[in-house]
């Protein structure tokens, strides 16, 4: 993975605009609520790239970040914006300005502000805000267990991720936070959705395999017979993560009836654990 500098992601014109905003705020901090919202209009909303990079301790996928998001982070970092100033931007910002602030969090030091804004996002159903806060980077994983973002808080946010159907793969390393209580919560949500005839978050099977609770293994076994290819793949990955050997025969029985190469490969690994 490439390592790069945050400022290098901006072209000269955008960087000049960011530096102008930094100078203005440095002269009069009261200009921050004016300079910050103007960034999308002044530097644009184009995507910053298509690669996954490492920037100052953060692991991010540039495909999820816009030029204005990076410019905002440059300004907030250079001006040492306080938590109070950032919360004021949140309180008075529109939907897009809040996205920009949440994207900036990926490049700011993890701290109480991160946790407070995670809480704001968790209490809403705004998909773009959830994606901006925890998607396309490792911010969730870097925050877990710090500054009051304990297991219970992390579980609630991951449950919101499941509720809004954001793919787990967009939260880099979030699978490491799997725990039995989260599995119980995800299974309860899955049961509710199934009863209502609604689709279940596919990553449910991946996470419950890492930290099974009562009912997890039955759900995983049912998953490898599911009609949805994505569910079967996730269930096979979950069974592998569970590390159990007693399901080798069941995997071997399923193998001849599985047509998808990626799922077959996982079933072969499972069946070899006899």
Report residues per predicted region.
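N-terminal alpha-helical scaffold/docking segments in eukaryotic complex subunits
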Residues: 1-79, 146-274
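Contiguous, well-ordered alpha-helical segments that form the cores/surfaces of helical PPI scaffolds
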Residues: 72-77, 87-88, 99-109
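Alpha-solenoid HEAT/Armadillo-like helical repeat scaffolds in large eukaryotic proteins
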Residues: 85-93, 104, 116-125, 129-133, ...
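Glycine- and acidic-residue-rich phosphate-binding/metal-coordinating active-site segment common to enzymes
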Residues: 108-166
